[in-house]
Amino acid sequence: MRNVGNYYINCECGKETSFTAAKSYMSQTVIALLFAAVLSHDEKVLEQIKKAPDIIEQSLCKNIEEQVKKSVPLFRNVQDILLLGRGFSYAVANETELKIMEASYTNAKAYSSCDYPHGPIATTNRFIPVIFFLTDEKTNDSTIKLVEKIKKDFSVSTLVVTIMKNILQWLTKRV
């Protein structure tokens, strides 16, 4: 590889043993973020990158796996899953689409939540559950409105993946 490009960065993640390429994907994502932070001289981002292992460990210690296991029955016997996100969350939805298809052989399709109401929503039906990714406080309101519309108009089962600790309180405040 050293002879292919002018420069070479080893991900240092070891041999990839997962068919979903989880280690290499996460390592390459961190390298891309690190590259952008160094290029822009953004010390805040560099500090956040250094905290990432602790943040991931903390997330896993807070019953995240149990929450995931509780939501899985909703998706167990479906043939299709929709994933919606906006901004950074759209990239997460796209990667989740691949991981779901590779790991479970379930058809999955990711859309931008701001584009979805303008065409793809016509394919929505109550037999296809939707996973929403909410991480951007600037766009959460419009995405929550889309969650509510899809649930009301199509009786679709939904899962919301969010960084918001008190999403129910937040929803109550915006009404």
Language model features with spans:
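A SIS-like phosphosugar-recognition module
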Residues: M1-V175
